[in-house]
């Protein structure tokens, strides 16, 4: 998919994804910044301004070389005619056999300008301020020759994505890469010149892989490419030749497996995992077990010699820089250091204020907050509970929680995701780490994030740290068990990631937030019919868990309003279910709400009726709109506050009902019946507390009105 990196309001990265190199090769992109599309983020804007001021690659920055003035952007008026002609020439080199491809290319007509401001009039054309800055031609079954020459008039072209088409052969990238760019296909010679270059870069004549050795056809061009590429994923292609010499400690992720490479592995890569080079019969040397036969193998390797030559020439270029450039660089570095020091001081002040305010939390935090929209990478940490993400809404498990602030998974996480469902699109851990992420909340068990993958799929990622005592095989088996659970009112587990220190669970995404956010936050209030519908769905899901998991004393164990999510039709789905066997025994009584039940506080026991008690609390909370006192505090036992809360609800009777339900006289009797069911579920005596089967049957018999029962309701209840 397409991703942009912005500076000074204009997209910068110029890449396209490989189409079909014996296998689809997808170029990973940097995470997106909401500050480009929205107003500057509340805490991130200072850093953005800092980067714009000091970045030597800024479009309006001073030309450090002093001899490449063509790359400076001073003023510009979009040339619609030139853009149209360039795109039509490019279109003429393409062909497609798919209806969608004909639809997209058919919208490219001379009578209509490609861009109107920031809107693209031609399908697949991305625009900014009237300029064509990107082409997104994906999944169109395109074939033919990628005619880069025809795109030369597009002076502000920054992004090309030709993913999932039928192009064959080598993948052209005629535009240089930023230091944060990724590359997943070979960079070969291209006639594109400085008109499509980012300032200070021209790598159009460089080559990375292929039978021809790397050649310097323009000796004055700096060899900046290899030191900037920190991730290469070239597996499952047919690349030939040898591996060039990379500077040490530059490549963070490398995968060259299943190609036709040969020769010795460069020493700088000798500490990589052997699987990085597997499937290349001609490779030898560490970390592979096959040793090179003789030193002559390396001497006979023309690619190695040429890559070394390029490295040497690059060093010579740097040494020959003029004193004028050196002084400019030193000035920029000095400014960077000063601004960085000021930024650090400002961050410390903000963190101290945040820490002070956290000592006096508000009575109830909204489950939907606009404070969590700071943009950053899903892989980076952020101050306080601000973790990157894009999107328009968030939900949280953070009511009255004294747990640690949300922390984003870091890029140090390595390994593969394990999928438990066959009907979901596949993605890997690196896709999650690159995804736009949005913090959803931080609860007792861990942190939640919404991740928007490059293909547009949205998932919820739950990060747990209180599960590091469970054995690996036991964890895998429990995940497989959860993957087999299928119910319309359960949030499906899609995949998981295991590491001893922490675990990641990946779920489907529910778009309408949590029940708690509608009851206590700034979401729209729920009427009586919606609340009854939600309680019915929760009861069905709880009954399903009890039927499918008869060996567990607590099939759910963590039922609360913030763990009841709602889809766009207000259908409820439960999350954080069946986690009791995974949580460390030392923390389970502090973390899970089921251990607030009276039988655990009084007798130290947990039964299958404990989930019924949690359901009763949920019913009373739903009818009254009142948050259970001390319900989420990290303490053991039932607690006098929660006992008093239940007694107060019972004593207030009908006067405690939430006025936001907009009830009528016709529904008063049904509301009273549901209230009585909730009270029966909250009985402290286990013998008098209803069992789940009786509770579910009573709830499903309710209607939104006292008299009459619609056919649709009868059919709906019959499917219980």
Swiss-Prot record:
Skewed-composition ranges (Polar residues):
291-317, 356-382, 389-405
Q: Where can this protein be found?
A: Microsome membrane; Cytoplasm
UniProt keywords (A-Z) are: ATP-binding, Cytoplasm, Endoplasmic reticulum, Kinase, Leucine-rich repeat, Membrane, Microsome, Nucleotide-binding, Phosphoprotein, Receptor, Repeat, Transferase, Transmembrane, Transmembrane helix
Reactions that this protein is recorded to catalyse: L-seryl-[protein] + ATP = O-phospho-L-seryl-[protein] + ADP + H(+); L-threonyl-[protein] + ATP = O-phospho-L-threonyl-[protein] + ADP + H(+); L-tyrosyl-[protein] + ATP = O-phospho-L-tyrosyl-[protein] + ADP + H(+)
Among the GO molecular function terms of this UniProt record, one is: transmembrane receptor protein tyrosine kinase activity
What are the binding positions for ATP in this chain? 440-448, 462
Region spans: Disordered: 288-319, 356-409
What this protein is called in its record is Pollen receptor-like kinase 1
Q: What does this protein do?
A: Dual-specificity kinase with both serine/threonine and tyrosine kinase activities. Required for postmeiotic development of microspores. Involved in embryo sac development at the late stages of megagametogenesis. Involved in the phosphorylation of KIP1.
